[in-house]
Structures are given as structure tokens and as C-alpha cells.
Regions:
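N-terminal helix-loop segment corresponding to the beta1-alpha1 unit
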Residues: 1-156
Length: 156
């Protein structure tokens, strides 16, 4: 039996937890998720314990949990060749999930407005710690954030 998102393609430009968790839920619901990772480095979450061993290979348990049911490619979106490949992927996608530092993809010419011209039907999910809805930017909207930062600032 097909799952609810079977046939939906998601391009996931993500790292650590917020983006991977979001796209994990989409993958669990049947979407084809293609995770973009930096060549030679990958998602930094790959190096965070605890590690589990399988067939003599140690892997980060958290990374494996949040990135299940996904495909993954190493792609340098900072050079022209990598940008072109990324744009081609987006042209054939339904959704982009992105949780990089606010403004970083815009500087590369790969932000929402850039990608929307390539694929007018694209759904673009940008995850940030302090929000970044155009026209409603708060004083911290350009700052990167992790869960612990939000907890500290809210007094939890």
C-alpha cells in the first residue's frame, strides 16, 4: 500500500537536527528525500556520539535515526557545477527543506525567490531558530540557533 506522500520528491539542504527531523517525517510518510551533504564533511551530525557499530563500522546513532529512509549525495553548492546540479534537482522536486544559517543560500543565489523561478510549484520550507518571514524579521532573525539557544533565551 502506498504511503500518503508516495510520489513526492523532497530536496533536503539540511544539517544537525531541525531539517533532518522535518524531512525524516516526510520520508516516513513515503516521500523520496534526497539529502544534500558537503563533500568530505557531510552532515556534522555524523560525528556526534553515541556511535553504534554494525559490521565493524561505527556510525552516529542520532544521524542514522534522523536520516532514515533518505538518499544522500555529496554536493558542493558553492561552485558553479554544484549549483547547476542542485538547480536541476530542484526543477524536478516538489519540496525543498532547508535549515542552513539564515541568508546563506540567498548569498549563493539558491534561496526561495531564486528557486521559485526554476520551479513555480515548489514548496520551500526554511527552518530557523528566530524566524525569517519576509517583511516580519525580528532583531535576531539572521542569527543561527540550536534548541539549547532557544531554551536559554526563553528561560527554560
Amino acid at each position: 500500500m502506498d504511503r500518503p506522500l508516495t510520489g513526492i520528491r523532497v530536496i533536503a539542504l539540511e544539517q544537525y537536527m531541525a531539517g533532518p527531523y522535518c524531512s525524516m517525517l516526510l520520508a516516513d510518510a513515503g516521500a523520496e528525500v534526497i539529502k544534500i551533504e558537503r563533500p568530505g564533511i557531510g552532515d556534522p551530525r555524523r560525528s556526534i556520539p553515541p556511535f553504534v557499530e554494525n559490521n565493524g563500522i561505527k556510525k552516529a546513532g542520532g544521524f542514522m535515526a534522523y536520516n532514515r529512509n533518505k538518499k544522500s549525495i555529496a554536493l558542493n553548492i558553492r561552485n558553479d557545477e554544484g549549483k547547476k546540479i542542485y538547480q536541476d534537482l530542484v526543477k524536478n522536486a516538489d519540496v525543498v527543506v532547508e535549515n542552513l544559517r539564515p541568508g546563506s543560500v540567498d548569498k549563493l543565489g539558491l534561496g526561495y525567490h531564486d528557486l521559485k523561478t526554476l520551479n513555480p510549484k515548489l514548496i520551500y520550507a526554511a527552518i530557523s531558530g528566530f524566524g525569517r518571514l519576509e517583511g516580519y524579521e525580528g532583531p535576531d532573525s539572521k542569527r543561527p540557533a540550536f534548541d539549547i539557544v532557544a531554551e536559554a533565551m526563553s528561560g527554560i
